[in-house]
């Protein structure tokens, strides 16, 4: 069949091309094309005729593909192609392009059907590129924009604002097809340089989308777009048919007119003809579209730098950086006149007449429409949810005629307050805006301006010809009160905490905070003195992420000034090291810049997010507050060798020193305090001294147990022995720091029982109670260690004066209520007295006992929650009734195969009815299935609000588990940031009952970066299986469960749901080595970017668990989770689950102060996983969480003076 192709001269002629195998031809005469010669008539006709629209789009794509194929373009690498075959039985066969050779214009392909076929010449044999749709980019799939992530605060649903309709006058400019060279440059700068990423959930990728149908135009002229589906306009939705402004006088080219970046302007430099610009209706000019926006504002004063302050500009931007960033667009004759500003456009009242400033973060800015700056109201798109009421959007400074005129006349620099696509086409576009400009699919929505990487970051300026150019970037000293207030410990911002909680949090994570500060200082010290550090202002609802490893960027990072590509400190350091050594950086590939230019480390710009020196000022306040409250500091800052390692001065402050010949370094920098902050204590300051009337009376050899026994007789004083305070250096954090010598200064302090029982973990010698709990009394008969970490035994020895031999005779599971010590918490012990089980989920004292075991890294169980829940909400019938028609993916637990095309109802039908389950194709046997990711993502709260409320109202230990819990550090993250997804998440699966199923796991061995509370809300005993109880009992016994657990099943008649095996986080490396050893024995490979634990590819059955203990000495906790049990799993603890019956479990994640160190380490581990790994992305933002938790804690503590006179002795928080 003949296919008609558009020529390059317009629609005046049609070229028929015959392909191999086609036998029919269809010709279209010129007369039939007359009705669509007029552009506006073409718009209307194509909008109504979707078939013609799709044909045009398909032809353009095919034309582009042919050009790339005939040239052997390397951009086709990874693309699926069809190759014509002369064999009549197989007319086409599929292959994958693995290499392109532009010199020989051939393609190297990989064909499974004909392995011998390696080289294809598209000029000799017909080759077609396979497209799933017109918005895919090779093999890459993109859920969202590469770097930025929207906040869930505005709701989960994202809707596009409806657009009003208006008419446009006829155009006299003919429509021309896109030149191949232009399209190639477009795809080269964005498609080939932008790999896929799954880090965003709201901005789909469209890299191979066809560009606009338009002519080559001289700079300053503008074409008129077709409707929305070809050039993002052939859309069935009722939208405004927009025209483009005549900007010849202003020298401004609207980015909507051209989909090419600044690097592509050379292609458009030759004029092909003149364009007559149509005028838009005045009604359209005055129509303003009201759209909601995220509430994030700058101060009322606008961030504009006047050119009269020449010294300030020179000081803010280094000459080398200025030379690289300035982009002066060449303009043709007649374009140098300054634009005339026409009144009649609504003015902004938020800025004064003398100062022009950007709009609020997240504002919906408008396009420049004409010389009179008419606004294209429909070009804006909001990412806000309809559920959130937000103030009207503030407009860009460029949309105000008066302010625009003043900016052009004065040449003042101002901050970019709109996305790149809404400014001008001459300026380099960031990566997000280049992708946004190429989207053509009607279902894809444009990003809000806040997702532009240069939004409120890049500074712009009009030159003397009235052409907009890049002036530089914001610097750290250009902050305002609102920007700095987000990072300072202000008491007015602290809610949901108290003094005791603040002290406990600071005692646990203060050292980690100091290590973050030292790591930032060390990274800052590597920056050359002559290089200017830029400041990237935090944007509400946007999470800055490394484009290489997907880790959340905390503060210092490196940014490409041309496209906004950003990398974290670790990736930059590794890349630079490999470049110096001549090695290839194989861990992760760096995406390319505009026009496929390589990102070299030396061309990137150091950038910080925290304004000014706030990070270092808060670090000083932390030391001051800890000394003020007697909170011991075991951080490296406590050593005097770091005393001079103070806050680095800003680069502006270093210029004077560099000019005088001095070489500044961190050891010689003068400490400078921010005027916003009070003077802080010097690092290494000793903690506050105890009262002078306190005298230590205990001998040096007093045992911990004897000291604790003295508590009941009133002897509460004890002298601390000299200790060597060491802090493990975090992996990949501060490698360059020298080793820390021990501190030789002794600290004589007093302890109360309350302060000691609640002591956080600092080191191995940190507390008498911890030493007692960690003591070992040998091995039992079966060879397993019996470590009596029993609070009951300790309390009983105090109250009842029992000896250790008497304690061993006490029956297991005996509940003791030592009310004299302040604990009245019903509980018992499982796993041979190694697992605490709390019996009353609503007891107010639970967290006191829980915390002592939790800080040891032990799991904890709470029983009886099902009595508090609304059971009707959690039955399978309710889920089937509400969601039975939803399509989901199922996983076969025996084979790990994914079953698609099923519904939620299919799963619930077999939940308690074995014969009604889905059957496999071969044996026709019922499968053991689990629901995969349902409800999907973060939809639990929105999809099941009543169940969410029921769970949150009854989940135990709310201080930790609720989103606003005072000991849940994730609650300290301000709403300004993207909140981490901490659940709840549902886990629904059938039971594995048969003996053969004991080698399978419902969830294989893995670990999580955060703590978790897993609630068993329903246990379903299926019908149709015999001898279920006997098989379940054997599985429990085979799983190494203790006698008390078995009694719960046999005598207590409780419903067992799942068998857990949990291991201590400290044993992770041993388990990893063991699994690698076993995999090598089985002939399996161990790739560098994969991990046997993170890959969830192993389930440890009885034989493997036995080998693990015998060869590595690793013993875990075997826990049977009954109906109503809540299992608390510490962060970083490897664990696996085997369902005994059909179970419905709900898990809520949280971040506890006790386990932040594991979050730190795991974040570094996840960086080295493959980019397709589910745990690869740093969703927790652990550094941001730590910073703001410490910030709030010191804000609370520095505002209150400790009243030591009200207590008998000073409680020393350690």
Swiss-Prot record:
A motif (LXXLL motif) lies at residues 769-773. Its EC number is 1.14.11.65. Testis specific. Expressed only in male germ cells. Pfam families: JmjC, PWWP_KDM3B, Tudor_KDM3B. Coiled coil: none annotated. Residues 371-380 have a biased composition (Basic and acidic residues). The modification N6-acetyllysine is found at residue 779. The keyword Iron applies. GO terms for molecular function: chromatin binding; chromatin DNA binding; histone H3K9 demethylase activity; histone H3K9me/H3K9me2 demethylase activity; iron ion binding; nuclear androgen receptor binding; transcription coregulator activity; zinc ion binding. GO terms for biological process: androgen receptor signaling pathway; cellular response to leukemia inhibitory factor; formaldehyde biosynthetic process; hormone-mediated signaling pathway; male gonad development; positive regulation of cold-induced thermogenesis; positive regulation of DNA-templated transcription; positive regulation of gene expression. The modification Phosphoserine is found at residues 150, 209, 330. Fe cation binds at residues 1006, 1008, 1135. Binds 1 Fe(2+) ion per subunit. One of its GO terms (cellular component) is histone deacetylase complex. Residues 194-211, 361-370, 381-391 have a biased composition (Polar residues). A zinc finger (C6-type) spans 546-571. Residues 944-1167 form the JmjC domain. Transmembrane segments: none annotated. InterPro entries: JHDM2-like, JmjC_dom, KDM3AB_Tudor, PWWP_KDM3B. Its main location: cytoplasm. The keyword Transferase does not apply. Belongs to the JHDM2 histone demethylase family. PANTHER family: JMJC DOMAIN-CONTAINING HISTONE DEMETHYLATION PROTEIN (PTHR12549), LYSINE-SPECIFIC DEMETHYLASE 3A (PTHR12549:SF7). Interacts with VRK1. Histone demethylase that specifically demethylates 'Lys-9' of histone H3, thereby playing a central role in histone code. Preferentially demethylates mono- and dimethylated H3 'Lys-9' residue, with a preference for dimethylated residue, while it has weak or no activity on trimethylated H3 'Lys-9'. Demethylation of Lys residue generates formaldehyde and succinate. Involved in hormone-dependent transcriptional activation, by participating in recruitment to androgen-receptor target genes, resulting in H3 'Lys-9' demethylation and transcriptional activation. This is Lysine-specific demethylase 3A. It comes from Rattus norvegicus.
């Amino acid at each position: 069949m003949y296919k008609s192709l558009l020529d390059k001269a317009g629609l005046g002629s049609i070229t028929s091309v015959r392909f191999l195998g086609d036998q029919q031809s269809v010709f279209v005469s010129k007369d039939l094309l007359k009705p669509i010669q007029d552009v506006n008539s073409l718009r209307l006709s194509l909008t109504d005729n979707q078939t013609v629209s799709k044909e045009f789009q398909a032809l353009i794509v095919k034309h582009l593909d042919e050009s790339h194929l005939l040239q052997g373009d390397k951009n086709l690498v990874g693309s699926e192609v069809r190759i014509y075959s002369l064999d009549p039985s197989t007319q086409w066969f599929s292959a994958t392009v693995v290499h392109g050779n532009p010199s020989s214009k051939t393609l190297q392909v990989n064909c499974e059907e004909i392995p011998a076929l390696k080289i294809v010449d598209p000029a000799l044999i017909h080759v077609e590129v396979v497209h799933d749709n017109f918005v895919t980019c090779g093999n890459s799939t993109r859920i969202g924009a590469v770097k930025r992530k929207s906040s869930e605060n505005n709701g989960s649903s994202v809707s596009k604002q409806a657009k009003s309709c208006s008419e446009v006058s006829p155009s006299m400019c003919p429509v021309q097809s896109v030149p191949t060279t232009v399209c190639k440059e477009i795809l080269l700068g964005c498609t080939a340089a932008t790999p896929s990423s799954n880090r965003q959930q709201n901005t789909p990728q469209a890299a191979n989308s066809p560009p606009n149908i338009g002519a080559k135009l001289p700079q300053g002229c503008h074409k008129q777009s077709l409707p929305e589906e070809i050039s993002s306009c052939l859309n069935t939705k009722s939208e405004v048919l927009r025209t483009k402004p005549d900007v010849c006088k202003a020298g401004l080219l609207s980015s909507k007119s051209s989909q090419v970046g600044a690097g592509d302007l050379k292609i458009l430099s030759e004029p092909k003809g003149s364009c007559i610009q149509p005028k838009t209706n005045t009604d359209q000019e005055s129509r303003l579209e009201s759209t909601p926006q995220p509430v994030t504002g700058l101060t009322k004063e606008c961030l504009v730098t006047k050119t009269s302050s020449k010294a300030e500009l020179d000081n803010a931007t280094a000459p080398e950086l200025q030379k690289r960033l300035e982009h002066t667009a060449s303009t043709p004759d007649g374009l140098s006149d300054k634009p005339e500003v026409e009144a009649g456009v609504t003015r902004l009242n938020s800025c004064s007449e003398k100062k022009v400033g950007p709009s609020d973060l997240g504002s919906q800015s408008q396009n420049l429409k004409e010389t009179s700056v008419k606004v294209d109201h429909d070009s804006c798109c909001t990412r806000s949810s309809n559920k959130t009421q937000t103030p009207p959007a503030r407009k860009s400074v460029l949309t105000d005629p008066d302010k625009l005129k003043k900016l052009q006349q004065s040449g003042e620099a101002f901050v970019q307050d709109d996305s790149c696509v809404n400014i001008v086409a001459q300026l380099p576009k960031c990566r997000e805006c280049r992708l946004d400009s190429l989207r053509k699919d009607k279902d894809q929505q444009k990003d809000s301006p806040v997702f532009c990487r240069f939004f409120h970051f890049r500074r712009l300026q009009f030159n003397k010809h009235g052409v907009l150019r890049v002036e530089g970037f914001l610097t750290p000293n250009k902050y305002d009160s609102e920007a700095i207030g987000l990072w300072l410990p202000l008491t007015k911002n602290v809610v949901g905490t108290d003094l005791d909680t603040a002290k406990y949090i600071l005692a646990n994570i203060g050292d980690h905070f100091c290590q973050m500060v030292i790591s930032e200082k060390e990274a800052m010290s590597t920056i050359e003195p002559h290089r200017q550090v830029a400041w990237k202002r935090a944007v509400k609802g946007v999470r800055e992420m490394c484009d290489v490893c997907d880790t959340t960027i905390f503060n210092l990072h490196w940014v490409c000034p041309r496209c906004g590509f950003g990398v974290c400190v670790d990736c930059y350091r590794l890349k630079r090291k490999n470049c110096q050594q001549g090695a290839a950086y194989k861990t992760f590939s760096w995406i390319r810049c505009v026009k496929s230019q390589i990102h070299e480390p030396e061309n990137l710009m150091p950038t910080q997010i925290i304004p000014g020196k706030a990070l270092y000022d808060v670090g000083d306040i932390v030391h001051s507050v800890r000394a003020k409250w007697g909170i011991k500091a075991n951080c490296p800052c406590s050593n005097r060798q770091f005393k001079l390692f103070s806050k680095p001065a800003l680069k502006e402050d270093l210029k004077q020193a560099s000019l005088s010949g001095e070489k500044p370094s961190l050891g010689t920098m003068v400490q400078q305090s921010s005027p916003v902050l009070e003077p802080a204590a010097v690092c290494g300051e000793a903690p506050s001294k105890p009262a002078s009337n306190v005298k230590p009376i205990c001998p040096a050899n007093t045992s911990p147990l004897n000291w604790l026994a003295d508590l009941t007789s009133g002897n509460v004083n004890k002298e601390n022995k000299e200790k060597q305070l060491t802090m493990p250096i975090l992996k990949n954090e501060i490698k360059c720091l020298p080793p820390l010598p021990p501190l030789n200064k002794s600290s004589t302090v007093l302890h109360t029982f309350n302060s000691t029982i609640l002591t956080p973990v600092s080191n191995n010698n940190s507390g008498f109670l911890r030493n007692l709990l960690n003591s070992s009394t040998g091995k039992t008969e079966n060879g397993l260690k019996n470590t009596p970490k029993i609070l009951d035994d300790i309390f009983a020895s105090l109250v009842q004066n029992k000896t250790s031999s008497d304690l061993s005779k006490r029956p297991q599971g005996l509940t003791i209520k030592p009310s004299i010590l302040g604990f009245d918490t019903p509980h018992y012990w499982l796993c041979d007295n190694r697992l605490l089980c709390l019996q009353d989920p609503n007891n107010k004292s639970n967290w006191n006992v829980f915390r002592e075991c939790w800080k040891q890294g032990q799991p904890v169980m709470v029983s009886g929650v099902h009595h508090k829940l609304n059971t009707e909400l959690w039955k399978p019938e309710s889920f089937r009734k509400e969601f039975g028609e939803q399509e989901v993916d199922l996983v076969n637990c025996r084979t790990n195969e994914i079953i698609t095309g099923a519904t939620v109802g299919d799963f619930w039908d077999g939940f308690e009815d074995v014969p009604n389950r889905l059957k496999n194709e071969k044996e026709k046997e019922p499968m053991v299935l689990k629901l995969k990711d349902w409800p999907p993502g973060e939809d639990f709260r929105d999809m099941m609000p009543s169940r969410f409320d029921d769970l949150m109202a009854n989940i135990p230990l709310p201080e930790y588990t609720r989103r606003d819990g005072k000991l849940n550090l994730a609650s300290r993250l301000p709403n300004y940031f993207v909140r981490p997804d901490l659940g709840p998440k549902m886990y629904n699966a059938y039971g594995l009952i048969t003996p053969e199923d004991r080698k399978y796991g419902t969830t294989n061995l893995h670990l999580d970066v955060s703590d978790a509370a897993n609630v068993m809300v329903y246990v379903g005993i299926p019908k149709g299986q015999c001898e279920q109880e006997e098989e379940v009992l054997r599985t429990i016994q085979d799983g190494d469960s203790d006698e008390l657990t078995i009694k719960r099943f046999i005598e207590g008649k409780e419903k067992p749901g799942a068998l857990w095996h949990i291991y201590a986080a400290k044993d992770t490396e041993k388990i990893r080595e063991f699994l690698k050893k076993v995999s090598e024995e089985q002939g399996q490979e161990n790739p560098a970017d994969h991990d046997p634990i993170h890959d969830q590819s192993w389930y440890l059955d009885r034989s493997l668990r036995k080998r693990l203990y015998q060869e590595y000495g690793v013993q875990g906790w075997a826990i049977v989770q009954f109906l109503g049990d809540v299992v608390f799993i510490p962060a970083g603890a490897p664990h696996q689950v085997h369902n005994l019956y059909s179970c419905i479990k709900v898990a809520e994640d949280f971040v506890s102060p006790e386990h932040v160190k594991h979050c730190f380490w795991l974040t570094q581990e996840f960086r080295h996983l493959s980019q397709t790994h589910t745990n690869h992305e740093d969703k927790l933002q652990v550094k941001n969480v730590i910073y703001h938790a410490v910030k709030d804690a010191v804000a609370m503590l520095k505002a209150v003076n400790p009243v030591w006179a009200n207590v008998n002795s000073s409680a020393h928080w350690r």
